[in-house]
A protein has these predicted regions:
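Active-site histidine-anchored catalytic micro-motif
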Residues: 1-128
């Protein structure tokens, strides 16, 4: 298992981690198999999303803000936990010829809901 570590810069933020995952796959030597990507944080998520248009990333954050509005929640950062729970904490992706099988417009992103802070994403490459 490998760990991607970084510091987020904003309260809510979407960070492309595809290149980090690709590098881990190449270094693993695995040609065909799967890669598991796991976010061990309850206020962040990992997703597959559109990569070419940054306005869609802003739209995603705005949509989640509307779904989980400011309220007098019992927990001080309940909004971040609730938003993260609407997405996912793990992904399993196919690796073929040492490449992640993503669509033309897709990338893997970490979505931050409680930044700025230190974050980790665990990546495990599994051979066929």
């Amino acid at each position: 298992m490998k760990t991607i570590r970084f510091k987020t810069e904003h309260k809510s933020q979407i960070i492309d981690i595809t290149d980090d995952i690709k590098e881990i796959i190449i270094k693993s030597g695995v040609k065909n198999g799967v890669v598991s990507v796991f976010c061990p944080h309850s206020t962040a998520s990992v997703i597959i999303f559109e990569k070419s248009d940054p306005t869609l990333r802003r739209d995603l954050l705005m949509t989640l803000k509307n779904i989980v509005p400011y309220k007098d929640y019992a927990h001080k950062n309940a909004r971040a936990h609730l938003k993260a729970s609407l997405l996912t904490s793990n992904l399993t992706l196919i690796v073929e010829n040492a490449k992640i099988m993503l669509g033309k417009w897709q990338s893997v992103f970490l979505v931050e809901f409680d930044g700025p802070r230190e974050r980790s994403v665990y990546v495990k490459v599994i051979n066929d």
